[in-house]
Amino acid sequence: MIRTQLELFPQKIKKGQRTKKIIIRKSSSNYFKDWNESLAFMARNFNPGDRKYYGGMIDGDGSFNTYLPTKRKGIKLMVGLELRHDHAEPLLKLAELFDLTISKKVYLIPKGNTQPSLSVEFSGIKAKLFLFSIYPYLLEKKEKATKVLLQMGCPEQYLLKERQFSFEYLAGYTDSEGTVCFSLQHHVRPQRPTYSSYHMYYQLTSNDGGHLQFIKKSLIDLGFNHFRKDQKRTYEHVKKREGVDYNTNPQTWKPTSVLRLGGTPAQLSKFYEQLEPFILIKHKKENMLHTMKYNHIINIR
């Protein structure tokens, strides 16, 4: 458990400081300028399944941007990923694949139920290799990636625009923006016996409704046609938070599309059989396995 701010940093908290970063893993290969054997090994080790998975992960929680360094010539590319510290299995794997430095961000001032996070940021030829490798599998951020890679000098003929679906991609997006629910609920009824039942569903959210509709159509084409009614969350009744230094104005927020796959335990289990092998975050994988186990138990003859 993270200790209080005074226990962690008794003499180093600056006025107005809300967070502190701690390096917990240091890269041994930060300054590659040209192609070399270490990069070739990383490229070979970054297999197609991993590339598809991180296409989904970056579409959800990842970021990539170009910038102009103040003391160096030419445009530079920066790729970043930040995940909650206890849901960070994808980030840890990525750090191993590309030998990245991992930072841990802790909140010095308690802020609701906000948890510490882990993050990686990498630039240069590593970032270019990574983005070019996942480019064919990006969906939501493909247009942005096209512009960035063209800026970085990638030949346009290698940047194919068609979109493709895979369960590896969906696993990455699920670990980023998905909910896998398997919970026991107790129902209290007036003058009637209380009963309990399991609540289970699979859900994705995105500010890009077209992206979710592409995923939905792809799953329907594969036979998973047990979606619930699409939802859209709006924020016109959310009040703006004052006194903070980041954008919390609900008037600027895009509506959030919600895609939920329901159905029977058997239907969800059939879907999870395809998806679960590629999931990395432990609690989401466990909820899928619990659903499949429950379905097996209730169907024992």
Named regions from a protein language model:
Residues 1-301:
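Internal intein/HINT superfamily modules and their associated LAGLIDADG
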